[in-house]
């Protein structure tokens, strides 16, 4: 099978790109990232030559490189001979993110359009690839009361008309030839846990196919859309109903072989309600502890709201978990057995107060569990602070930034902060993928990334569409 040539923008450490490469159907011919540590990580793992731009206002994009510079500097004419099939990426999304703050601060892009987004459009107009993948945070859909999302979809679909308006933002003379717009063959918020990622992480994904390739009318487009939706909804596998869990990716074994480990982990929490002594703690005992069976399969089904599980279906789901662990490279390799040279397996520094606090916060609970006690955290009003992941449920979203209490916490009572490698596993990075930079920079690289497994599924869906046209 042929491999489609791909250009990546806003590439970060390469999570999205790695998934496309792992699919076996795409090869990355050029990438761009403004942050040097992330670009170094990308180069050393994905093999593109690193080029660091100087002070010149304009640089020609060079095939076979990842260029560390502002996308505004890039002259895409250097890639015209590549005949790019696909452009992938998503402009930095902090301003769109719901996690970042209240609604008034969720600005998105205004009607004049954000500068970085406009450069993604510039690449489409200049290079006219067969298809594109644009990913971003779900909050983009509602930013500016939905105006940002509407403008983006219309820009992609009516690029031949909108390009004259957009190119003024990026000070570009643009493409001298005809500019084709794109048929949107998929747009939606994708829950990556339904694709096998052991984490509740949602992203907006938009996939476009160049209009001259999308001929055949409504019926053809509907068929292509249905094909992508079938993959990205997770319905091709049982994982959309039976999610992969943190205990599996940390231990390197499927659930049905982790019964003793699970029981050991949960029994450590016996009596925590008496230590904390609050009504919330005693309510947790009634609501959670008293309902535990300590049978890993029964509790897994209960915690994930899976009712009427068919025995044969459950067995098939557990087999898919084993296959997936092997696909990820985690099978038979507990994360705590790893000693990697990039510092990601090193135990993080933890103050005594944090350790003592976390000993009183059970899985799936947060700092509010110890409110009104001597372990209370002052001035904390958001639920993601000091939150423990649960061994049998997809973890909460791995975040890139934040101060005390936002680093992610292990389900084992004898553990507190997750290591960077544990965070990388929750993001489905292979253990062979090494990160470069200072620890806060590595944390950001991991947290900002699209999970490679999710990217691989997106790539597989896109390859089916490109093969069909």
UniProtKB/Swiss-Prot annotation:
Spell out the molecular function terms from Gene Ontology.
Answer: DNA (cytosine-5-)-methyltransferase activity; DNA binding
Q: Which InterPro entries match?
A: C5-Methyltransferase (IPR050390), C5_DNA_meth_AS (IPR018117), C5_MeTfrase (IPR001525), SAM-dependent_MTases_sf (IPR029063)
Give GO BP annotations, semicolon-separated: DNA restriction-modification system; methylation; negative regulation of gene expression via chromosomal CpG island methylation
Query: Which SUPFAM superfamilies does its entry note?
Result: S-adenosyl-L-methionine-dependent methyltransferases
Temperature effect, per record, is:
Optimum temperature is between 70-90 degrees Celsius. Highly thermostable. 34% of the activity of the unheated sample after incubation at 90 degrees Celsius for 10 hours. Lowest activity detected at 10 degrees Celsius.
Reaction it catalyzes: a 2'-deoxycytidine in DNA + S-adenosyl-L-methionine = a 5-methyl-2'-deoxycytidine in DNA + S-adenosyl-L-homocysteine + H(+)
Ranges for the SAM-dependent MTase C5-type domain? Answer: 4-469
Q: Which domain of life is it from?
A: Archaea
User: Key word Transferase present in the record?
Assistant: yes
| Biotechnological exploitation | This protein may be useful as an epigenetic editing tool due to its high thermostability.
Active-site positions, per UniProt?
Answer: 93
Alphabetically sorted, this entry's keywords are: DNA-binding, Methyltransferase, Restriction system, S-adenosyl-L-methionine, Transferase
In the UniProt record, does the keyword tRNA processing occur?
Answer: no
- Quote the EC number: 2.1.1.37
Which family is this sequence assigned to? Belongs to the class I-like SAM-binding methyltransferase superfamily. C5-methyltransferase family.
| Entry protein name | DNA (cytosine-5-)-methyltransferase M.ApeKI
Where does this protein come from, organism-wise?
Answer: Aeropyrum pernix (strain ATCC 700893 / DSM 11879 / JCM 9820 / NBRC 100138 / K1)
What lineage is on file? Answer: Archaea, Thermoproteota, Thermoprotei, Desulfurococcales, Desulfurococcaceae
């Amino acid at each position: 099978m042929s491999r489609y040539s791909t250009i990546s923008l806003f590439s970060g450490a390469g999570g999205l790109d790695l998934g496309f490469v792992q699919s076996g159907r795409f090869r990355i011919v050029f990438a761009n990232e403004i942050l040097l540590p992330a670009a170094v990580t990308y180069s050393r793992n994905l093999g593109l030559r690193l080029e660091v731009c100087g002070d010149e206002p304009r640089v020609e994009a060079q095939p076979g490189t990842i260029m560390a510079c502002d996308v505004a500097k890039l002259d895409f004419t250097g890639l015209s001979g590549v005949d790019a099939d696909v452009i992938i990426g998503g402009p930095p999304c902090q301003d769109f993110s719901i996690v970042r703050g209240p609604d008034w601060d969720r600005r998105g892009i205004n009607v004049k359009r954000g500068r970085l987004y406009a450069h993604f459009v510039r690449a489409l107009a200049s290079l006219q690839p067969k298809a594109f993948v644009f990913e971003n945070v779900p909050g983009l859909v509602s930013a500016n009361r939905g105006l940002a999302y509407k403008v983006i979809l219309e820009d992609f679909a009516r690029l031949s008309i909108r390009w004259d308006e957009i190119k003024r933002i990026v000070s570009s003379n643009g493409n001298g030839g005809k500019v084709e717009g794109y048929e949107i063959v998929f747009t939606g918020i994708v829950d990556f846990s339904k694709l096998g990622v052991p984490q509740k992480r949602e992203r907006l994904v938009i996939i476009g196919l160049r209009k001259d390739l999308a001929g055949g009318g409504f019926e053809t487009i509907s068929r292509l859309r249905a094909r992508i939706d079938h993959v990205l909804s997770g319905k091709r596998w049982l994982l959309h109903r039976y999610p992969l869990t943190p205990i599996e990716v940390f231990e390197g074994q499927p659930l049905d072989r982790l019964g003793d480990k699970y029981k050991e982990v949960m029994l450590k929490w016996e009596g925590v309600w008496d230590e904390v002594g609050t009504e919330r703690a005693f309510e947790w005992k009634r609501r959670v502890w008293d309902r535990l069976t300590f049978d890993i399969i029964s509790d897994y089904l209960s915690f994930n709201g899976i009712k009427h599980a068919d025995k044969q279906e459950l067995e098939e789901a557990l087999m898919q978990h084993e296959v997936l662990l092997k696909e990820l490279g985690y099978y038979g390799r507990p994360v705590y057995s790893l000693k990697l040279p990039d510092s990601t397996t090193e135990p993080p520094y933890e103050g005594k107060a944090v350790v003592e606090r976390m000993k009183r916060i059970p899985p799936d609970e947060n700092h509010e569990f110890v409110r009104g006690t001597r372990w209370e955290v002052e001035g904390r009003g958001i639920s993601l602070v000091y939150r423990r992941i649960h061994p049998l449920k997809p973890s909460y979203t791995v975040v890139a930034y934040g101060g005390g209490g936002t680093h992610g916490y292990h389900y084992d009572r004898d553990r507190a902060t997750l290591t960077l490698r544990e965070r990388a596993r929750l993001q489905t990075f292979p253990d062979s993928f090494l990160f470069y930079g200072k620890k806060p920079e590595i944390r950001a690289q991991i947290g900002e990334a699209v999970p490679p497994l999710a990217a691989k599924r997106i790539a597989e869906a896109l390859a089916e569409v490109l093969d069909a046209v």
